[in-house]
């Protein structure tokens, strides 16, 4: 009998972090209950069908597929038997106000031709930048990812002071790191916008975030066949096969405590579920406020883990095709510094935002009726700020600015061709997922506030309470929150020993 068999684990929240934790713990022999307040698993990886269109409501990009594969192989399964993924090419298409269009491509020769549009020597600079990005990634994978390092002191202990200083470019911002190698302003902007993965500003995030381009080029950029939600369905199926009990439409209202430990979770319907270990996929600060009723002194310690940005999310079904689009597209601001400062410093809506646009029908036409396509639009905007409240009219005005900008940059008569629409503001995101102040990516990466670290996975209040998801290390995005579930299993097993 496995020594973990009698350990009852309750996982709160069935986002990818919660699903990953449940699977990893069940594989290690724990008895696991997974409690989800919504009517389906997946968290922000969500799906909606409307008027013949199938919308992926959450993440649109899959990278680092080996992290997902590890969940399945750890359980003696093959991921390909549960879900199919395919590479997306080009990675991104980048549109600028002057009419320039630059693709990011996996194939080196194609990438050279694209970057040659920006002038001689640009590709050589890009290659030197990728070498720098690779070094950052290699060092990060060795400790932060592989060992689950959970903060600055863990990092210093593992790498040592000198290696930490030399390996992670600690005195520069992401933007400064890019500009060490890249002189063309368009390529600077493209590389800076890899920060979209973690919902932060390249001017405030540490240079370590420059590992993101190498991750994308090395591991590829992928799509889940049939829609991104298929990954959540595959993980749900695996969890059930491993004996995880999943309760949907069940909201946790309290984590009950005794002698410095979590002893049970209480549901909104009054049910009390005893637990030996609790794992929360609810973000750390909302969980401390809502489930733990943490004292002000504990909450104050968490202030440096400020929420990431949010987004105005437009899911459009249009009755025509836009052949100039790739699967993933960026329409850049003419004033990138002003855009990021608006979002992250003054907490207002940008006058000229950079826009991320996903056209999944380029890879998967079956997601829309014949002759139609899906266009998902996501400009980054501030998280909810109680001191600078934005109104429905403010969000509506931004929607109009965004659509006008896209029409000006080539999406002719876009507004006239919208036949169905789903429109989310930070208020909707907060209400649906209980994310901290409506943030999308968990905790902001800011070298002055938190050195780019997220909150620790172990609770500082209760010895058997752990956290997973985008608000804790290693951070936001599909692969990182999935990795967090695997790392928390390792911490729990180590703590029990």
From Swiss-Prot:
Reactions that this protein is recorded to catalyse: all-trans-4,4'-diapolycopene + 4 AH2 + 4 O2 = all-trans-4,4'-diapolycopene-4,4'-dial + 4 A + 6 H2O; all-trans-4,4'-diaponeurosporene + 2 AH2 + 2 O2 = 4,4'-diaponeurosporenal + 2 A + 3 H2O
Iron in keyword set: no
GO process annotations (BP): carotenoid biosynthetic process
Keywords tagged on the record: Carotenoid biosynthesis, FAD, Flavoprotein, Oxidoreductase
Swiss-Prot/TrEMBL cofactor(s): FAD
Broadest EC class assigned to this enzyme: oxidoreductase
SUPFAM superfamilies: FAD/NAD(P)-binding domain
Metabolic or biological pathway: Carotenoid biosynthesis
Observed effect of gene inactivation: Cells lacking this gene accumulate the fully unsaturated C30 carotenoid backbone 4,4'-diapolycopene with some additional less unsaturated intermediates.
Protein task: Involved in the biosynthesis of C30 carotenoids. Catalyzes the oxidation of the terminal methyl side groups of 4,4'-diapolycopene to yield 4,4'-diapolycopen-4,4'-dial via the aldehyde intermediate 4,4'-diapolycopen-al. Also able to catalyze the oxidation of the terminal methyl side group of 4,4'-diaponeurosporene to form 4,4'-diaponeurosporen-4-al. It has moderate to low activity on the C40 substrates neurosporene and lycopene, and has no detectable activity on zeta-carotene or beta-carotene.
Listed name of the protein: 4,4'-diapolycopene oxygenase
Origin species: Methylomonas sp
């Amino acid at each position: 009998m496995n020594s973990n068999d009698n350990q009852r684990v309750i996982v709160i929240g069935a986002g990818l972090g919660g699903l990953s934790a449940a699977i990893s713990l069940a594989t290690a022999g724990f008895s696991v209950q997974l409690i989800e307040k919504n009517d389906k698993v997946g968290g922000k990886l969500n799906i909606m069908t409307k008027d013949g269109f199938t919308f992926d409501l959450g993440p649109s990009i899959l990278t680092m597929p080996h992290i997902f594969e590890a969940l399945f192989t750890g359980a003696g399964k093959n991921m390909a038997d549960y879900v199919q993924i395919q590479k997306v090419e080009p990675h991104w298409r980048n549109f600028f106000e002057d009419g320039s269009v630059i693709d990011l491509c996996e194939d080196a020769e194609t990438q050279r031709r694209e970057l040659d549009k920006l002038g001689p020597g640009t590709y050589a600079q890009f290659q030197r930048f990728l070498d720098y990005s690779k070094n950052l990634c290699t060092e990060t994978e060795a400790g932060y990812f592989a060992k689950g390092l959970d903060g600055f002191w863990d990092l210093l202990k593992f790498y040592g002071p000198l290696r930490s200083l030399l390996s992670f470019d600690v005195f520069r911002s992401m933007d400064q790191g890019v500009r060490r190698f890249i002189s063309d302003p368009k390529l600077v902007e493209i590389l800076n916008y890899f920060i979209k993965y973690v919902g932060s500003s390249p001017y405030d995030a540490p240079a370590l975030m420059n590992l993101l381009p190498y991750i994308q080029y090395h591991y590829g950029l992928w799509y889940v066949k049939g829609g991104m939600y298929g990954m959540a369905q595959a993980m749900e199926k695996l969890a059930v096969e491993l004996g995880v009990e999943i309760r949907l439409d069940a909201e946790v209202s309290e984590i009950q405590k005794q002698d410095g430990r979590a002893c049970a979770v209480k549901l909104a319907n009054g049910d009390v579920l005893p637990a030996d270990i609790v794992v929360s996929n609810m973000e750390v600060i909302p969980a401390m406020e809502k489930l733990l009723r943490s004292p002000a002194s504990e909450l104050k310690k968490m202030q440096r883990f400020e929420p990431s940005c949010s987004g105005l999310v437009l899911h459009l079904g249009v009755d025509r095709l836009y052949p100039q689009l790739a699967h993933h597209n960026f329409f850049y601001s003419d004033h990138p510094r002003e855009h990021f400062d608006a979002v992250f410093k003054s907490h207002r809506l940008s006058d000229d935002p950079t826009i991320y646009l996903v056209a999944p029908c380029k890879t998967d036409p079956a997601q829309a009726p014949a002759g139609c396509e899906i266009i998902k639009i996501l400009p980054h905007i501030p998280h909810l700020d109680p001191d600078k409240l934005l109104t429905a009219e403010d969000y509506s005005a931004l929607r109009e600015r965004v659509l006008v900008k896209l029409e000006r940059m080539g999406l002719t008569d876009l507004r006239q061709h919208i036949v169905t629409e789903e429109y989310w503001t930070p208020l909707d995101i907060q209400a649906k997922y209980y994310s901290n102040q409506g943030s999308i990516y968990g905790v902001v990466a800011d070298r002055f506030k938190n050195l780019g670290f997220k909150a620790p996975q172990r609770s500082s209040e209760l010895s058997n309470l752990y956290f997973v998801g985008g608000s804790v290390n290693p951070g936001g995005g599909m692969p990182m929150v999935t990795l967090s579930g695997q790392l928390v299993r390792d911490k729990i097993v180590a703590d029990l020993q």
